[in-house]
Amino acid sequence: NLHLNDNGFTYFYDDDWDKTQAAFRLESETFPGLTARDGSYSKDDFRDFQRYALSRGVEVIPEIDVPAHSLAFTRFRPSIGSTPEEYGKDHLNIMAEETYGFLDSLFTEYLAGPDPVFVGSRFNIGTDEYSNRDSVVVEKFRYFTDRYIRFAEKYGKTAMVWGSLTHAKGQQPVKVDGVEMIVWSNGFANPQEMHDLGYKMVSMPDQILYIVPHAGYYHDYLDTRDIYDTWAPHDFRGFTF
């Protein structure tokens, strides 16, 4: 899973959104100026990278993480972002039609055509850590998730998501069949609940497998011996399937 966009936490940057690091690291001809200047993939380089990996039996799964983790997009186009008073500038405004038009165009740039930029069979649309402030937000988030699952599938991709449907429980249906969910935090996606809904799950428990150097809340390095001795992928931190 290759994360093509993200941003830092404001508390590492004097609680100032304008100072907070953010980047989108893939060439975009649809939105010139969106791509980070301090390191990025060209479209051709990214195609070549994925094909090389496939030739070695590895599928690179591209991820564009929305509607949270999106400061690179809201900095490029502030009109699609939430305000700091709402959720934070790293949240897209999922109530605004302009947001959907922007993402439709961006995703289409990489999914469409005879030689799409995203080469493999999967595309990760993100969907982790968005606000669940009230039922209106939750239901719109669930709509957003379902919409972009189906958008990915329209281009022949298996849609992947970061599990968030325990955090965002609601009534709006979210597609299950054919969707692959990364279960990373039991508070965001309870493994038993997701299993009962019928999702195909990928076990990636954050407290065991995440490396975020110097952050203080995840590992600086992985204890590979401990992981080998005490954990197996079917163990979702207390839920074993």
Regions found by a protein language model. Name each.
Residues 164, 172-179, 186-241:
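Flexible, acidic glycine-rich loops studded with aromatic residues
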Residues 2, 182-183:
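Redox-cofactor binding/interface segments in oxidoreductases and associated redox assembly factors
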